[in-house]
């Protein structure tokens, strides 16, 4: 598919593939009221022939509203697309390592990524935006792995959990440096992500956005060297 507009007038699928099929979407607008694209074969989604927009129309509640859903032994490779107005932007229903996200623009979704129990997603470091993640596990047993260990730069991903624990606290998306994947864990403190500076504890441990700091922990901030001709004016908190 190299462009065009494709619309489902009912809650039926706009694009519905079968097992052992191969589908390449290189551009086009795809719109439906329920699940827009359901893949059971091998699918590549990119924008090599034009912009690719996957949009859920309306806000009906009688069935799930998803942008791209993967089932069975499907392999889904999302290199570039805009996914919007979905309850589940990318829904990995089956096959734990079946979805690879290289890049996408998420817009007005309730959950950008939705993972059924025991499912993961591969997110490459070419994805630099923020994505919200929700899992179907009930209850959630932590640590709950959410990304595979197949891609580099997992510690740099901007992932936010849309799940809460029994106390109403949103789970923290931590990083397993040994096994190279992101996982959900209870929130026990705060994170310090210093920009143009270094944040340390006890003068040795460097903090980043995947490291929690217990409440009350003294943190030392050290500004980076100012560019030539400029001076350090002060700190700004966000």
Language-model features: locations:
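Beta-strand-rich solenoid/repeat architectures in extracellular/passenger domains
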Residues: 1-13, 22, 26-36, 46-65, ...
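Hydrophobic residues embedded in beta-strands of well-ordered beta-sheets
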Residues: 23, 43, 76, 179-182
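A short, solvent-exposed beta-strand micro-motif common in secreted/extracellular proteins
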Residues: 45, 78, 101, 217-226
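Surface-exposed interfaces of beta-sheet-rich extracellular modules
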Residues: 147-174, 218-238
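N-terminal capping/linker segments that flank leucine-rich repeat
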Residues: 168-187
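Secondary-structure capping and domain/repeat boundary segments
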Residues: 186-238
């Amino acid at each position: 598919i190299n462009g065009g507009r494709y619309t489902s007038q009912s809650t039926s699928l706009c694009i519905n593939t079968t097992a052992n099929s191969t589908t390449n979407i290189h551009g086009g607008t795809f719109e439906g009221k329920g699940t827009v694209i359901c893949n059971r074969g091998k699918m590549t989604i990119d924008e090599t022939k034009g912009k690719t927009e996957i949009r859920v129309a309306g806000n009906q509640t009688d069935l799930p509203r998803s942008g791209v859903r993967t089932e069975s032994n499907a392999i889904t490779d999302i290199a570039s697309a805009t996914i919007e107005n979905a309850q589940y932007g990318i829904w990995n229903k089956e096959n734990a390592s079946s979805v690879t996200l290289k890049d996408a623009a998420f817009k007005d979704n309730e959950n950008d990524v939705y993972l059924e129990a025991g499912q993961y997603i591969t997110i490459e470091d070419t994805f630099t935006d923020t994505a919200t993640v929700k899992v179907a596990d009930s209850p959630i047993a932590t640590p709950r792995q959410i990304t595979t260990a197949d891609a580099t730069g997992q510690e740099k991903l901007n992932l936010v959990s849309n799940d809460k624990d029994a106390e109403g606290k949103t789970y923290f998306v931590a990083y397993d440096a040994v096994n190279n994947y992101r996982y959900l864990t209870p929130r026990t403190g705060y994170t310090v992500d210093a920009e143009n500076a270094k944040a340390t504890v006890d003068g040795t441990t460097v903090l980043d956005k995947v490291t929690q700091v217990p409440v009350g922990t003294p943190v030392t901030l050290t500004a980076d060297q100012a560019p030539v001709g400029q001076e350090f004016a002060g700190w700004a908190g966000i």
